[in-house]
């Protein structure tokens, strides 16, 4: 930043002094109808926004500058936020002309985690700021959604869990103490992938005292956060950041909650991605995800609540049952759903309206919208109070007690107020007699003059008397010379003209004062009334937030009921067992996206139970699922995991029936991709995810594995897959669904009592393969990879060659060198007996010995794993 030089203009000096206080932000400096940027800010902003960079003369130098219209600033701020910038908004806080230079102040700082503008925020996504107070291992974590006032904190045991929780909610910005180990905090920040704001260590100290003072309580025990010193430190820092950036007391943050780190079903990042809960694997979009299917909410807070429940499925059967009761009641009646939707609609996004108003960023339109929301609450409350489900009745009970405030706002705020206070007309007529009189003067000046003129003519008998105005004398009464003898004594002479004289009266002076200052007085009084209303809303913020929260819950339950009714889903039985029994289960998203003429989704049954559960003997704990490519193995795996997740979030499930024993964690190892940015190959990613499963799965977990070991050689892959399956069966004993193309793994069922073999059925019709999509008992002997390649459009020549090589491999046909005869049959000309083939070599004694051993094998008694071991030994002998 350029130094403040003596010859700078007062305005430029003001700019530089302000910029010095916000060195890490782009400074939007209000000049008239524009926000201007100078120096490095102008260069950075012009590049980011693709706007013209100009220059302003400063002595012999030219200062880079650019600007945006103040009425369009919101869009430009949003674009800068997307590119990772912070923006400090410096506004004029007094009218021009009252002093040599207009006083300006930074009214707020907009950062990625401190956004309140509804044109920038996604209405259906939370906007979390993450704050970390590092400990020796792990540390305190706070999550603050400043746009709604939600503040949560907790403590986690290690940095990996910190990252996992921050990525779970998709934090927009991260707070870290400056004094923390930079290597460690940099690693956390990189893993989270959010912009970082480093704050003074002091903001993480005296946390409990500061939080108690802000919340106005003697202790924090009632919030359930006592005994979390690091968590409270992170929360206090987040609250301080909110107050500093918004230049206002965040009274809408009226409570603090314990972060849901226990008592919820845990989903790591890989699982959330593999199951496509909130972002699709193709393009990272919301479309095609489970959340997109589930969110049938009427209001934005309802949509955010559905997303929250999806991120944090429950582990308490009673709490799950309470949600299911509400969903079942609403699902049973289309009239009940329609009535509730109609009652919820006018409530809108009261949470974010409240936040903007309390922080001084709301306008009269926000007050009007809040009035509409509050006016709708009594009818919504009555509707919910009449339901049977306790969750619905409880929500309705939290919406009472705001009728007086709703009435006040409705009476005070105009029906369609302007966005700006300076436009006037934000207060409804009849609310303030004083304001009504001022408005009448301002809007009926000519009528008042005409009435005054008529009154004076009648009183004085001067028929030619006129009331006039000019800029020099203001308002005056003009009397011609022939009528001067009729002028009353109280008239004060102001000027003599050729044709007569000009006078003023006390009444005319008073009128002039009223007219000339009416607009200013109107603006001032409307602003005062607006601030009084805002303060009244702020006082009621806890009650408003509670009512809005209840509305979000009711809307989320309605959303789940709508999906269940429209999709034909069933209520699951959720208990404390360790069984998972699904009859006629479907994949919710795949089914929803099928074309109408597709014939419908083919349902499947899944029944698996952890070791130790009474159902273990019937179902087994590990299902080895084989079958062709494209037959639907991965879909079956995912739909089983999604069924458990849906049940524990309190939703109906896409099945004929389902019994879900509580699952503490869902793990998935599905698909394969490189992580080039972190230098990890496909196989390394696969093994890292598998290691996390083996280290963290418990007997109550649900593990879904798809194609373990395929990123390396066949022998290595089979060995790893076999060992992983044994570990999960023998050591963990959890419910496991293991899809594989390694048919050798089917032999596990001979050795392990809890292993069951399943396959996805196909039917061969001539040289065509029909995928039946049905999961049946038994194993597969072929993967039909070449048939799938044909469907994909591989050239006929390539397919023919592939079939030839496959026949050689399946027959284990060896060439003269003892190698699988992959190249046999592909001759491009005669070759002499001594010529080396593509894979061949001259005959040797070792190869001859191997042929004899192979010829003597008892194939009927040979297990697949024994065969692999023999092949490995032969390979070693061949060098």
Residues covered by each model-derived region:
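Extended, charged coiled-coil "arm/hinge" scaffolds of SMC/Rad50-like chromosome-maintenance ATPases
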Residues: 497-535
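Charged catalytic and DNA/RNA-contacting regions of genome-maintenance
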Residues: 2-329, 338, 345-358, 362-454, ...
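Active-site phosphate-binding and catalytic loops of NTP-dependent enzymes
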Residues: 88-90, 112-121, 249, 385-391, ...
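ATPase nucleotide-binding head domains, primarily ABC-like/P-loop NTPase cores
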Residues: 39-40, 228, 298, 308, ...
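Non-catalytic alpha-helical coupling and interface elements of nucleotide-dependent molecular machines
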Residues: 24, 50-51, 82-86, 92, ...
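Charged, surface-exposed helical/loop "interaction arms" that form contiguous linear patches used
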Residues: 359, 363, 373-376, 390, ...
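C-terminal tails and terminal domains of large nucleic-acid-associated
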Residues: 847-879
């Amino acid at each position: 930043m350029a130094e403040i030089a003596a010859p700078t203009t007062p305005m430029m000096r003001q700019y530089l002094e302000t910029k010095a206080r916000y060195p890490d932000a782009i400074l939007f400096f209000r000049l008239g109808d524009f926000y201007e940027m100078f120096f490095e800010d102008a260069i950075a902003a012009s590049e980011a926004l693709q706007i013209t960079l100009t220059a302003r003369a400063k002595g012999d130098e030219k200062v880079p500058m650019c600007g945006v219209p103040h009425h369009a600033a919101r869009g430009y701020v949003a674009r800068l936020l997307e590119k990772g910038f912070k923006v400090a908004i410096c506004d004029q806080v007094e009218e021009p002309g009252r002093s040599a230079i207009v006083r300006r102040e930074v009214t707020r700082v907009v950062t990625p985690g401190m956004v309140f503008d509804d044109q920038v925020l996604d209405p259906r996504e939370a906007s979390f700021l993450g704050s970390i107070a590092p400990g020796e291992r792990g540390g305190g974590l706070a999550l603050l959604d400043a746009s709604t006032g939600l503040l949560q904190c907790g403590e986690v045991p290690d940095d990996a869990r910190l990252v996992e929780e921050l990525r779970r909610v998709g934090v927009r910005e991260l707070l870290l103490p400056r004094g923390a180990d930079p290597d460690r905090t940099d690693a956390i920040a990189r893993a989270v992938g959010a912009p970082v704001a480093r704050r003074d260590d002091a903001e993480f100290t005296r946390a409990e005292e500061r939080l108690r003072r802000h919340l106005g309580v003697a202790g924090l025990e009632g919030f359930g956060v006592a005994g979390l010193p690091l968590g409270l430190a992170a929360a206090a820092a987040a609250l301080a950041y909110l107050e500093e950036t918004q230049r206002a007391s965040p009274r809408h943050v009226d409570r603090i909650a314990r972060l849901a780190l226990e008592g919820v079903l845990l989903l790591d990042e890989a699982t959330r991605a593999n199951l496509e809960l909130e972002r699709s694997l193709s393009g990272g979009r919301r479309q095609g995800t489970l959340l997109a299917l589930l969110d049938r909410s009427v209001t934005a807070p309802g949509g955010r609540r559905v997303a929250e429940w999806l991120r944090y499925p429950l582990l308490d059967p009673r709490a799950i049952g309470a949600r299911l009761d509400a969903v079942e009641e609403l699902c049973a009646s289309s009239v009940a759903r329609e009535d509730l939707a109609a009652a919820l609609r006018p409530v809108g996004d009261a949470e974010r309206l409240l936040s903007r108003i309390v922080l001084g960023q709301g306008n009269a339109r926000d007050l009007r919208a809040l009035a509409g929301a509050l006016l709708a609450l009594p009818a919504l409350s009555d509707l919910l109070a009449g339901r049977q489900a306790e969750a619905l009745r409880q929500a309705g009970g939290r919406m009472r007690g705001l009728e007086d405030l709703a009435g006040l706002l409705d009476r005070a705020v105009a029906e369609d107020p302007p966005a700006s206070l300076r436009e006037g007309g934000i207060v409804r007529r009849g609310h303030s007699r004083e304001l009504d009189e001022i408005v009448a003067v301002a809007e009926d000046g000519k009528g008042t003059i005409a009435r005054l003129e008529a009154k004076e003519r009648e009183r004085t008998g001067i028929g030619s008397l006129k009331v006039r105005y000019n800029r020099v004398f203001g308002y005056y009464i003009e009397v011609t010379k022939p009528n001067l003898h009729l002028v009353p004594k109280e008239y004060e002479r102001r000027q003599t003209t050729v044709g007569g004289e000009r006078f003023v009266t006390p009444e005319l002076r008073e009128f002039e004062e009223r007219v000339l200052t009416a607009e200013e007085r109107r603006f001032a009084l409307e602003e005062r009334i607006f601030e009084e209303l805002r303060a009244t809303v702020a006082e009621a913020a806890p009650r408003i937030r509670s009512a809005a929260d209840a509305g979000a819950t009711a809307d989320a339950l309605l959303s789940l009921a709508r999906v269940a009714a429209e999709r034909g889903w069933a209520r699951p039985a959720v208990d404390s067992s360790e069984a998972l029994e699904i009859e006629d289960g479907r994949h919710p998203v795949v089914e929803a996206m099928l074309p109408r003429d597709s014939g419908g989704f083919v349902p499947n049954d899944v029944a698996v139970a952890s070791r130790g559960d009474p159902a273990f003997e019937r179902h087994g704990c590990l299902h080895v699922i084989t079958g062709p490519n494209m037959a639907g193995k991965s879909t079956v795996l995912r739909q089983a995991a999604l069924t458990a997740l849906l049940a524990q979030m309190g939703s109906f499930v896409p099945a004929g029936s389902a019994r879900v024993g509580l699952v503490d964690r869902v793990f998935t190892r599905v698909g394969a991709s490189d992580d080039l940015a972190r230098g990890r190959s496909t196989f390394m990613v696969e093994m890292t995810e598998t290691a996390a499963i083996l280290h963290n799965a418990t007997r109550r977990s649900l593990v879904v594995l798809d194609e373990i070991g395929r990123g390396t050689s066949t022998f290595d892959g089979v060995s790893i897959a076999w060992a992983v399956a044994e570990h999960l069966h023998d050591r963990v004993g959890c419910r496991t669904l293991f899809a594989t193309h390694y048919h050798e793994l089917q032999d596990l069922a001979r050795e392990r009592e809890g292993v069951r073999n399943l396959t996805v059925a196909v039917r061969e019709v001539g040289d065509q393969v029909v995928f039946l999509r049905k999961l049946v008992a038994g194993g597969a002997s072929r993967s039909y990879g070449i048939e799938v390649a044909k469907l994909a459009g591989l050239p006929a020549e390539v397919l023919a060659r592939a079939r030839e090589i496959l026949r050689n491999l399946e027959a284990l046909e060896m060439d003269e060198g003892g190698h699988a005869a992959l190249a046999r049959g592909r001759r491009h000309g005669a070759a002499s007996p001594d010529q080396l083939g593509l894979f061949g070599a001259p005959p040797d004694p070792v190869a001859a010995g191997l042929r004899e051993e192979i010829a003597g094998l008892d194939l009927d008694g040979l297990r697949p794993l024994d065969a692999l071991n023999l092949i490995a030994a032969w390979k070693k002998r061949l060098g």
